[in-house]
Amino acid sequence: MAGLEVLFASAAPAMTCPQDALVCFLHWEVVTNGYYGLGTGDQPDPNDKKSELLPAEWNSNKELYALRYESKDGARKLLLKAVSVENGMIINVLEHGTQQVADLTLNLDDYIDAEDLSDFHRTYKNSEELRSRIRSGIITPIHEQWEKVRLSSPPREFPPATAREVDPLRISSHHPHTSRQPTWRDPLSPFAVGGEDLDPFGCQRGGMIVDPLRSGFPRALIDPSSGLPNRLPPGAVPPGARFDPFGPIGTSPSGPNPDHLPPPGYDDMYL
């Protein structure tokens, strides 16, 4: 029982009753199972310090002992309460994460000799049995329940983020047009609208805020260079310039198609 005698020696000056000696043993058993003592009371305190020793004023209330613990890996926190009842003590332990509760009732006369509480070798009796009961009644149930909860809810795994996250509001870069569209760049400021019309070599974007040629939606295959009566020569319309076709849509070298529904008297020159 390494460490128990050292702990007892540090706490012996404050021991005045068998309950104190039993709580000292309880504290030692909890610490040897991977915990640090934090402090007294139900609620955390700014002055809490992790220690293997009993905290200050740990036995100020002989009727109700309340001690808080934290596991060395920080995963579990315990609240231990020991209530004095006649010639025994009821031990209650709460694990905050799982809300698991374990309790144990001990008879003081079975494990504590109250004749001389200053002598470590005389104070405790049946120490192995006491240690076994604490482990089976408090430590093991708390740890088993915590492991069960941890294994039933494994941590979620997220795939690594891609270089470009999918934005559901982004307009698709796929264009159903047969011709390749120039790269669209937004104006640097609202006052830049139409600025490309002043640049004879500007071929990166149009001058309109809403450009029907770059809207991202399907459009009719209208040739913007069509003129009257024939097509304009190549280069007549600067790339990216605002241009409204001024000739019949769909003209071809063979000439326009005849009207399929001529108006009445269309061939009467005197009409």
From Swiss-Prot:
Q: Which GO terms describe its molecular function?
A: endopeptidase inhibitor activity; proteasome binding; protein heterodimerization activity; protein homodimerization activity
Positions carrying Omega-N-methylarginine = 205, 231
Against InterPro entries, the record matches this protein to: PI31-like, PI31_Prot_C, PI31_Prot_N
The segments labelled Important for homodimerization and interaction with FBXO7 in the record are 2-150
- Stretches with biased composition (Pro residues): 255-265
Q: Please report which protein family the annotation says this sequence is part of.
A: Belongs to the proteasome inhibitor PI31 family.
Query: Assembly and interactions?
Result: Monomer and homodimer. Interacts with FBXO7.
The protein's name in its UniProt record: Proteasome inhibitor PI31 subunit
Q: Which gene encodes it?
A: Psmf1
